[in-house]
Amino acid sequence: MAKKTYDLLFKLLLIGDSGVGKTCVLFRFSDDAFNTTFISTIGIDLKIKTVELQGKKIKLQIWDTAGQERFHTITTSYYRGAMGIMLVYDITNAKSFENISKWLRNIDEHANEDVERMLLGNKCDMEDKRVVPKAKGEQIAREHGIRFFETSAKANINIEKAFLTLAEDILRKTPVKEPNSENVDISSGGGVTGWKSKCC
């Protein structure tokens, strides 16, 4: 049997309205890349990145979920087993911020009770087009007792910090145990891609 290359496996979800930049956030973290030509994610996409925290190698299994209404029935099954959820809105799109409460209800209905949540106000490099004040993001995060960052995949602002903070929060309340399996359940997902990369 092959030796495991990690100590813990954390399943993370990126959720939020279509077009808020979830895929760009994921690619910036996983591959330090930014591409303006992404098409909307169809169903689910998966990326894997291994990071080291507190002397532990942690495999982050990050699911990028479709934001369109018609895909909500697909994505609900992916809340199960998620240990961390990043809820993303676009600071230049008021509707994406207004829908935060709906996404938070989805988390309450479908995710584990103890899931770590984080709110990201994305595209903070587009200050001239901002319609959602930072204070509003901070307020809703406070009300729900969750962490908040403003991020930019394009300018690489707070992307790594957000992922590592979420992983640290999960690690703090995770009992140390051996990872169950190398297998990834993709039985009900859409297009899935994956790679492994190591953080130095």
Curated annotation (Swiss-Prot):
Signal peptide: none annotated. Mg(2+) binds at T23, T41, D64. Regulated by guanine nucleotide exchange factors (GEFs) which promote the exchange of bound GDP for free GTP. Regulated by GTPase activating proteins (GAPs) which increase the GTP hydrolysis activity. Inhibited by GDP dissociation inhibitors (GDIs) which prevent Rab-GDP dissociation. One of its GO terms (cellular component) is cilium. A motif (Switch 1) lies at residues 32-46. The keyword Plastid does not apply. Gene3D superfamilies: P-loop containing nucleotide triphosphate hydrolases. It catalyses: GTP + H2O = GDP + phosphate + H(+). A lipid is attached at C199, C200 (S-geranylgeranyl cysteine). It comes from the Eukaryota. Its EC number is 3.6.5.2. GTP binds at residues 18-24, 35-36, 40-41, 67, 122-123, 125-126, 152-154. A motif (Switch 2) lies at residues 64-81. It is a lipid-anchor. SUPFAM superfamilies: P-loop containing nucleoside triphosphate hydrolases. Its cofactor is Mg(2+). GO terms for biological process: axonogenesis; cellular response to insulin stimulus; endoplasmic reticulum tubular network organization; endosomal transport; establishment of neuroblast polarity; establishment of protein localization to endoplasmic reticulum membrane; exocytosis; Golgi to plasma membrane protein transport. It is an enzyme of class 3 (hydrolase). Keywords: Cell projection, Cytoplasm, Cytoplasmic vesicle, Endoplasmic reticulum, Endosome, Golgi apparatus, GTP-binding, Hydrolase, Lipoprotein, Magnesium, Membrane, Metal-binding, Nucleotide-binding, Prenylation, Protein transport, Transport. It is found in: Cytoplasmic vesicle membrane; Golgi apparatus, trans-Golgi network membrane; Endosome membrane; Recycling endosome membrane. PANTHER family: LD44762P (PTHR47980). Belongs to the small GTPase superfamily. Rab family. Switch 1, switch 2 and the interswitch regions are characteristic of Rab GTPases and mediate the interactions with Rab downstream effectors. The switch regions undergo conformational changes upon nucleotide binding which drives interaction with specific sets of effector proteins, with most effectors only binding to GTP-bound Rab. The small GTPases Rab are key regulators of intracellular membrane trafficking, from the formation of transport vesicles to their fusion with membranes. Rabs cycle between an inactive GDP-bound form and an active GTP-bound form that is able to recruit to membranes different set of downstream effectors directly responsible for vesicle formation, movement, tethering and fusion. That Rab is mainly involved in the biosynthetic transport of proteins from the Golgi to the plasma membrane. This is Ras-related protein Rab-10. It comes from Gallus gallus.
